[in-house]
Amino acid sequence: MTKYSKGNKVEYHPIGGPSGTSTSTGVIQQVIKNDSGEETRYEILNDHTGKAATYKERNISRILD
């Protein structure tokens, strides 16, 4: 089971990890699970730019209402 799901609106750190960088908001478009044991990744559509990119779970700060 993953911590976040498709359709969740989230706050995330687009650069680096959870330390001191600016945050962005967006909606999770896809959850990407790897059978090889790698960390789950999330494709997030950025609210401001309208572009989608893939991020690791550690880059996501929280779910927004």
UniProtKB/Swiss-Prot annotation:
UniProt gene name: prl65
Species: Schizosaccharomyces pombe (strain 972 / ATCC 24843) (Fission yeast)
Region (Disordered) residue spans: 1-25
Function in brief: May play a role in primary metabolism.
Protein name: Putative primary metabolism protein prl65
